[in-house]
Amino acid sequence: MSSVAITICILSLVASLGLWLGNIKIRGVGLSIGGVLFGGIIISHIMNLPTVASFMQQKNIVLDSQTLYFVQEFGLILFVYTIGIQVGPGFFASLRSSGLKLNAFAALIVLLGGLCSVILYYLFSIPLPAILGILSGAVTNTPSLGAGKQIIAELGGEQMTELMGMGYAIAYPFGIIGVLLAMWLIRLIFKIRPERELQFFDKEQQRQKGLAGINIRITNPNINNILLREIPDYDLNTVIYSRLKRNDELIIPHPNTTLYLNDILHLVGNKKSLNKMQIILGEEAGHEPLNSGDSPIKNERAVVTNEQVCGKKLAQLQIQSQYDVVISRINRAGVELIPSDEMALQFGDVLHLVGRQKNIATVLSLIGNAQQKLQQVQMLPVFIGIGLGVLLGSIPIYLPGFPVALKLGLAGGPLVVALVLARIGSIGKLYWFMPPSANLALREIGIVLFLSVIGIHAGEHFFSTLLSKDGFSWICYGAIITLLPLLIAGIIARYYSKMNYLTICGLLAGAMTDTPALAFANAIQENNGASVLAYATVYPLTTFLRIMLPQLIAVLLWAAH
């Protein structure tokens, strides 16, 4: 049996044991994917026991170091790339309004964690690889560990990277528990009732909801007997006129449709734009879409799956003028958008269509609406994206005063490229849409491979370090790095910014890129969308900062000696 085959068998054993450990939960909290790390540590520890090591030597059972290295790096690449593809479209949209505040708090948590690490490093003379590993474990961030190992190796400390894995593993358990503890302490300090927080959040969401619909009866005599396109601000594309009801007849309005008093228009847009149009046109006549029992006008949702229309602007497709169908709104990666002539369609866009059933059917055949295509993965863009990400990660970034160039590395490069490509959506016939199930599968495979190798490398000396004086100290250092930044940011967010508690919980989980903590935050109050929204908003920027932070710390502290 070759060393490569033996290595793959051992990795499979580690992954199986680790995933089983991760599924064990105590009061709803478990190691989750972090169990793979401890599966690797256990297997590695057993393999290094004198009797087992002697037996393996006799039977010539050895692990192939090159295979382990490749599996570790490729697993990391898969993990960060799929994260970028998943959150890319929503990330740029989330940077508006409240997203800026949330990301500022997330950046504060990251920077405070780095500051705590540097202070502990100088106070207690902790080895540099160890404090970087403790930092990564304390914030439960695997890409951070990968970036730290890479920069330490490039600085000439490749032999010391094992310390990083041990520091990561020792600090990791409290990294998970510490986030939950911070959420509980903030709730206790401010005497918060989660059910009231959910009510406040729901009210705020209704007030700020992206797009809404309204019926407006034309009572302004200045609008009587003019064309739809002559309405003030029509060309700004801030609202969509999806239906017109005249007496008992329901029709699709066109730019050249003549308007009369007592006509009722159904408009779609943000609340500010709708209020403005109400002042111009007349009085509100309800919010429900206009319907008539025997009307042929229907509405339907359809998904863009035809590669021929991906990347084409709505002006080129002329859907309203040719097919008498209105696109009232477009849902892209969970973000609702007002259609405009200059907007280009992307694979996976969900269109809200209004028109006659026969005309809608024609539009459906044009845009695709093939649900099975949403389950297919186009592999060519995946490898193009990974290749571009690795190239970007290899470009040196020279900063004044730094002895070596920084790099985005194998963790940062693919992440940045994936975010950008997911935002672009498609180039020609290449589209970067990935079905959620496929994305999750690749992401889980990547993180399992990476953590399996990290665990194997860390396992040889893990238990001896854990049971030593250093082991207990490292746990304490990790607890400080975990808890202090979270409490400071959480208290500031609540006391000064009056941030919703459920949003704070999502912020803390996202700033630590901690999925188990998000699950805990969701369990605080059922049907809680606040935590998920905050988590998704800060996750991409946090991951990027977590990747860059250990590199900055490593270069600065290495140069200081």
UniProtKB/Swiss-Prot annotation:
Q: Which SUPFAM superfamilies match?
A: TrkA C-terminal domain-like
In terms of Pfam families, this protein maps to:
Asp-Al_Ex, TrkA_C
Compartments it resides in = Cell membrane
GO molecular function of the protein, one example?
A: monoatomic cation transmembrane transporter activity
Q: Which GO terms describe its cellular component?
A: plasma membrane
Q: How does it sit in the membrane?
A: Multi-pass membrane protein
Q: What Gene Ontology terms for biological process does this UniProt record contain?
A: potassium ion transport
Work out whether the entry's keyword set contains Transmembrane.
yes
The record's listing under InterPro entries reads:
AAE_transporter, RCK_C, RCK_C_sf, Transpt_YidE_put, YidE_YbjL
Q: Which residues cross the membrane?
A: 4-24, 29-49, 74-94, 104-124, 166-186, 379-399, 411-433, 447-467, 472-492, 501-521, 538-558
- Keyword set for this entry? Cell membrane, Membrane, Repeat, Transmembrane, Transmembrane helix, Transport
Question: Where is coiled-coil annotated?
Answer: none
Provide the RCK C-terminal domain boundaries.
Answer: 198-283, 285-369
This protein's source sits in the domain of life called Bacteria
PROSITE patterns in the record, alphabetically? RCK_C
Indicate where this protein is primarily found.
membrane
Q: Give the UniProt family note.
A: Belongs to the AAE transporter (TC 2.A.81) family. YidE subfamily.
Please name the PANTHER family in this protein's record.
Answer: K(+)_H(+) ANTIPORTER SUBUNIT KHTT, TRANSPORT PROTEIN YIDE-RELATED
Q: What is this protein called?
A: Putative transport protein DNO_0009
